[in-house]
Amino acid sequence: MAKGILGRKIGMTQIFDENGVLIPVTVIDVEGNVVLQQKTVEVDGYQATQVGFESKREKLSNKPELGHVKKANTAPKRFVKEIRFDALNNELLALEVGTEIKADLFTAGEDVDVTGTSKGKGFQGNIKRHNQSRGPMTHGSRYHRGVGSLGAIKGNMKGKNLPGQMGNEQVTVQNLKIVAVDTENDLLLVSGSVPGPRKGYVVVRSAIKKGN
């Protein structure tokens, strides 16, 4: 059954498995997930589960937001997302509004996809942004780190490699394995790295493509 949960990236560490093999893992805090709404085909045109994570003060919320979370009998949330899968496979659809989702939703050994916002790098040139090669750095060369030839004078195609904003975009890493689940502290330990900085919000979903 497909499922999902919201969380905050704490950072990376490493653990040893039963064979003594060192595994780098990312620690994700999933404490405080609450089902805020169940979307239905009859009312909304599709099926999904709206989940909220990490409470915030009521002073920081507007009246529509307060009315929405009141139906779930919970505090306003900082991070709200919809977990959407095929209706027959979505395990979250069986949960009632206001139900708290814990780390034990997942078990060690499951494959997951983790979505987050990558670190923003600001305005960057082609060498860093698109991994292009630089020109000669010797005396007399007029081309060092420039863009180079862009083709015709007029009518450049959209998507051409040019300098611009780098990072700060949604990134999904697929087929990561849950190495361990800490039910006491509501933590997930996921193999490898996940997108975004420390304390960044992430969405952990069941893997769409199963790993080999």
Swiss-Prot record:
Domain of life: Bacteria
Keyword RNA-binding: yes
Keyword hit for rRNA-binding: yes
Gene Ontology molecular function: rRNA binding; structural constituent of ribosome
This protein's UniProt keywords: Ribonucleoprotein, Ribosomal protein, RNA-binding, rRNA-binding
UniProt region (Disordered), positions on chain: 117-142
A GO BP entry: translation
One GO cellular component term noted in the UniProt record for this chain: cytosolic large ribosomal subunit
Subunit structure: Part of the 50S ribosomal subunit. Forms a cluster with proteins L14 and L19.
Function (record text): One of the primary rRNA binding proteins, it binds directly near the 3'-end of the 23S rRNA, where it nucleates assembly of the 50S subunit.
HAMAP family on file: Ribosomal_uL3_B (MF_01325_B)
PANTHER family according to UniProt: 50S RIBOSOMAL PROTEIN L3, LARGE RIBOSOMAL SUBUNIT PROTEIN UL3C
Record-stated family: Belongs to the universal ribosomal protein uL3 family.
Record protein name field: Large ribosomal subunit protein uL3
Organism (species): Acholeplasma laidlawii (strain PG-8A)
This protein's encoding gene: rplC
